[in-house]
Amino acid sequence: LDQAPKGILIWRAILQWLGGIGIIVIALIILPFLRIGGMQLFHLEGDDPYDKFLPKISSVVSKIFIVYIALTLILFFLYYLNGMSLFDSLAHSFTTISTGGFSTHNNSFAYFNNITILNIAIIFMIIGSLPFLILAQSNFSNVTSIIKDHQIQLFLLILILAISLIYFFAKNYIDG
């Protein structure tokens, strides 16, 4: 990767970013029509429930897209302010928020040798894993309501348990 052309690397990052938002949009648009998932909240009563559905879903998708772009921009600036080049900041912000984890270097984040950059990546990968519908509806104005959401609580519980198990088994493996 260190020798790969920058055009290829940024293209790969852009595709990862578009895939991240694309899967969210597809889930919001397609699944309700198939009556799959918890998206029945968009179902409005009437003769044809989908007459009013598309304007509402368009509004929700727009909000989610704004949140996705805002998080990407915040991440870009945080990476840049903590020592990444403009190119690396852009590419890594695309791949972090989409949780793809692609890097522009052979050693991935170890290349930067910067714990702050690594912590930023961890935080934003967790944020990128959260339900964007909830993030868009809250506008990040009420963090308490986000944390009180049952999906997010379960996700964070599973995350904490997984990290604890990995730590326990890795520690036992290393210690012998």
PLM region descriptions:
Residues 1-176:
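Membrane-proximal intracellular helices of multi-pass ion channels
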